[in-house]
């Protein structure tokens, strides 16, 4: 090991809530707030590159980007109603057209239980199917009683 870093405080804390609304109230009003991980992962990439040059974690960062994208799309679509459908549709349409989304999809390596369908729907830009499938997944995940 040439360099070693010790951080005396957590740099990231992830808490899995029991329902999708707990991460933010009315997420559909400002859905971009759900996707703040994009900046965090970019900063991690920049940090690693500044110390190691082109880092070997590009695949892992791309995979993480896609995993968090899937999680947040499911949370967002879990709040789908006839009143917010157009806003969610418009956001997702613009979001999946982003070059970072397209680039990072190729690094996604789903483990057992991870979504294989959502990345395909993103690649094919099948927005309606993506919205309804994510809504279905949110119902499965968060409406267990």
Range-by-range predicted roles:
Residues 35-59, 102:
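C-terminal, non-catalytic tails of nucleotide-sugar-dependent glycosyltransferases
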Residues 18, 48-52, 75-80:
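Secondary-structure edge/capping motif, primarily at the C-terminal ends of alpha-helices
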Residues 77-145:
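Membrane-interface aromatic/basic loop that binds lipid-linked glycans or pyrophosphate carriers
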Residues 4-40:
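Nucleotide-sugar-dependent glycosyltransferase catalytic core
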Residues 55-74:
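Amphipathic alpha-helical protein-interaction segments enriched in hydrophobic
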Residues 39, 43, 68, 87-91:
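Alpha-helical elements of Rossmann-like donor-binding domains used by nucleotide-donor carbohydrate transfer enzymes
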Residues 16, 56-60, 83:
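Short acidic alpha-helical/loop segments enriched in Asp/Glu that coordinate divalent cations
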């Amino acid at each position: 090991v040439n360099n070693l870093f010790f951080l005396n405080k957590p740099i990231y804390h992830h808490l899995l809530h029991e329902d999708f609304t707990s991460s933010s109230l009315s997420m559909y009003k400002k859905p971009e707030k759900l996707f703040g991980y994009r900046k965090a992962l970019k900063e991690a990439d920049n940090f690693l590159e500044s110390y190691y040059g082109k880092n070997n974690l590009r695949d892992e960062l791309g995979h993480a980007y896609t995993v968090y994208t899937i999680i947040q799309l499911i949370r967002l679509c879990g709040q789908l109603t006839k009143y917010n459908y157009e806003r969610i549709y418009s956001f997702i349409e613009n979001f999946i057209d982003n070059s970072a989304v397209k680039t990072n999809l190729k690094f996604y390596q789903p483990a057992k239980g991870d979504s294989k369908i959502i990345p395909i729907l993103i690649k094919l830009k099948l927005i309606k199917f993506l919205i309804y499938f994510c809504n279905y997944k949110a119902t499965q995940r968060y409406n267990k009683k």
